Amino acid sequence: YTLNYSFTTAQEIMQGLLAGKVDHAVLGEPFLSIALRKDSTLQILADLNRPDSVSSGFAQTAILYAPAIKKSQKAIDSLLHLSCRFAVEQPEQAIRILEKEKIFASGMLTPESIERCKIDYRTASEAQENILRFLQLIGQYEPKALGGKMPDEKFYK
């Protein structure tokens, strides 16, 4: 079994699956849900986003603050936490808002796709261990991506 990186975007991977050019793939949302809707024979073999006793998951997205709004960080963190809880607790309404605001095209998201995302907002200090583990993984394969060193404690504040 060899790895094939000739498909470089999630959309290309999804199209490769649907065209039968790809047998196995790691595919994130919303492309996973779109592929499952278009081809009912596709199956999820593993959920890489399921924290368990062995792995607590890893940070997938970072929110960066411009220095000018750093003073509002607590309020922004609170709003982001509430927004994420809203998406988890009321996925249909969240989908309507995301579609209305043209963040996602109509039909791209489903309540199942939101559930599979395991949305859980944490501040950098709350997620420090997971962030560090993720950065160490990146550092193993591409140290230049980290500027050759791990961030110091100020990074998590």
Task: List the predicted regions and their residue ranges.
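Short beta-strand-to-loop elements that line the ligand-binding cleft
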Residues: 2-9
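Secondary-structure boundary/capping positions in well-ordered alpha/beta enzyme cores
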Residues: 42, 105-107, 145
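Surface-exposed patches in mature extracellular/periplasmic domains of secreted proteins
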Residues: 5, 87, 94-98, 146-151
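Short hairpin/turn module used for nucleic-acid contact or packing/dimerization
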Residues: 4, 24-26, 153-157
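Residue-level "edge-of-site" marker
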Residues: 30, 48, 111, 127, ...
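Conserved C-terminal helix/tail region of periplasmic/extracytoplasmic solute-binding proteins
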Residues: 132, 136-157
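Secondary-structure end/capping motifs
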Residues: 71-141
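Pocket-lining segment of extracytoplasmic ligand-binding domains
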Residues: 11-98
